[in-house]
Amino acid sequence: AGDARVVEWDPRDPDRAFKATPVTQVTNFYACYGDEVLPNQKNGELGHGKERAAAIADVLDAHTGAQDEAVAWKALRAAAQEPNPEDITSNTQWSVVFDNTEPAAAITLRRHWGDIDAFAL
């Protein structure tokens, strides 16, 4: 809930200027060109994974007003990628949920949803 922005370099700007795009979820694509990114395919320099961002949105939309840490983990599980034997980096390597009231976070590696480590700063 609340206001959110993705700040990223514009891949089409020769000066690589920063852009701040209002979004509540994003995966491996440039949010500033989200309307040009198609799901379930590579989109050149613009990236991929729009279907996973949609999976996150579906979970968050289903829990409007009650988005706690459990909902955040549910959204991350919905968007997780299984390993691709032909591309070792094409899978969910880590997932993190940040605490928006305390300087803390919880993280898991490689979709080990039952093995979550919490950190406080």
Question: Could you tell me what each predicted segment is?
Answer:
Residues 2-121:
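C-terminal, well-structured catalytic/ligand-binding subdomain of enzymes
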